[in-house]
Each structure stands twice: as C-alpha cells, then as structure tokens.
From Swiss-Prot:
This is Fluoride-specific ion channel FluC. It comes from Citrifermentans bemidjiense (strain ATCC BAA-1014 / DSM 16622 / JCM 12645 / Bem). The chain crosses the membrane at residues 5-25, 32-52, 67-87, 96-116. It catalyses: fluoride(in) = fluoride(out). The keyword 4Fe-4S does not apply. The lineage of its organism: Bacteria, Pseudomonadati, Thermodesulfobacteriota, Desulfuromonadia, Geobacterales.
C-alpha cells in the first residue's frame, strides 16, 4: 500500500510539471504545433531511459523508488493520450502534413531521447 501512495504522490507531481512545462512551451512557441506535448514526452523519454538503465546496472535506485518515479512521476509527466488527441485534431482540421510530422517527430525523437538516456546511464 505504501508503494501506491508514493506512485500517486509522484504521479500528481508529474501532472503538475506537465501542466506548467507544456504551458510554458506553448507560450514561447505558440500553438500551431503540439510543442508542449512533444516537450514533456521528450523529457520523459530521456528520463525513463536514464533511470531504467541506471537502475538495471546499479542498486542505487531501489525498486520502490524506481516504480514511483517511472510509473508515478513519468506517467504523470508524459502523455500519449494528449499526443493522440492533438494529432487527431490536426487531421480533423485538414492539417495532414503537420499531423504526419507530429507523429514522425514524436516517435523518432522520443526513441532517440530514450537511447540518449540509456547511453548517459551507461557512462555514469
């Protein structure tokens, strides 16, 4: 039960971080492209690569903390559902090219950020 509390608390923190970070990114770059969602997903992809690889190679992150961070915080920070909704809206609005770019950039860049996180963890 204690682990569920940690997951919930860090999940709430991740949600708040997503709200403020994506809002800031949209203020800076505008809303013509889902920049805010892309930003939080890129950060989350990097962090999950870093944390998971580091925890596999080291006992420095106990499983309870790893689950709280990855399932809770990163689960709250990142958002596949918003990515899906924003892409669907782009398609509905006739912005086919922007929707395709969003899908391709999101998938390729998130995989790349995960890989970079793994490489950083291996270098530590």
């Amino acid at each position: 039960m204690e682990q569920l509390v940690y997951i919930a608390l860090l999940g709430a923190l991740g949600c708040l971080c997503r709200y403020f970070l994506s809002g800031f990114v949209y203020q800076v770059f505008g809303t013509s492209f889902p920049y805010g969602t892309l930003a939080v997903n890129l950060i989350g992809a990097f962090l999950i690569g870093l944390i998971m690889e580091f925890s596999v190679r080291s006992a420095a992150i106990p499983p309870t903390l790893r689950f709280a961070i990855t399932i809770g915080f990163l689960g709250g920070l990142t958002t596949f559902s918003t990515f899906s909704f924003e892409t669907f809206r782009l398609l509905e609005d006739g912005a086919l090219l922007i929707a395709i770019v969003n899908v391709l950039v999101s998938v390729v860049a998130c995989l790349t950020c995960t890989w970079i996180g793994i490489m950083v963890a291996r270098a530590l």
